[in-house]
């Protein structure tokens, strides 16, 4: 079960797989999609510019993607951040690859806003607090309209010639 604007959407099985197969409408729209990935704003957490890059195939661990798929996924992350910066949506971001057992893994692109620092001093350490705060305080028609506008901006830019060719980058850390 997921929620959006206080509405419940029932999902049977893996929400990530249902999302990838278009078994339900993505409330905030899809900003970018290709054969392997979908990019959209997180409709459950109404933070402006909070995007999810989700593989269409079900994976639980990063290493289940090929090197080319990982490169492509992080190219999408890179392009999304550039578009958000160029359109003055946000200037700082945290990137999290959420890898959980029995879940459809995906990348979170989390914008950094001043209000987050007011809630807690270490954003990554307290990400749950930030997400819960957004769920409790930002589920308004106005915020969802802004989220839809940002999705349209990102979608338009992904379609432009400037972003047609994926920029090859290497954002992997050695652990």
Task: Please state what every model-predicted region is.
Residues 1-175:
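HIT superfamily nucleotide-processing domains
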């Amino acid at each position: 079960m997921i929620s959006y604007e206080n509405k419940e959407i029932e999902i049977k099985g893996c929400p990530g797989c249902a999302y990838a197969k278009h078994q339900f409408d993505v409330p905030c729209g899809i900003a970018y999609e290709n054969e392997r990935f979908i990019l959209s704003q997180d409709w459950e957490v109404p933070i402006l510019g909070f995007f999810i890059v989700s593989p269409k195939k079900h994976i639980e661990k990063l290493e289940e993607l090929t090197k080319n798929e990982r490169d492509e996924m992080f190219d999408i992350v890179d392009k999304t951040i550039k578009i958000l910066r160029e359109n003055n949506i946000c200037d700082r971001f945290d990137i999290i690859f959420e890898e959980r057992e029995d879940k459809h893994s995906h990348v979170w692109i989390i914008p950094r806003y001043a209000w987050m620092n007011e809630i807690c001093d270490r954003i990554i350490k307290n990400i749950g607090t930030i997400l819960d705060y957004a769920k409790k305080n930002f589920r308004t028609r106005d915020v969802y309209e802004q989220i839809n506008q940002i999705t349209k901006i990102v979608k338009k830019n992904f379609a432009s010639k400037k972003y047609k060719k994926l920029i090859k980058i290497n954002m992997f850390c050695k652990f």
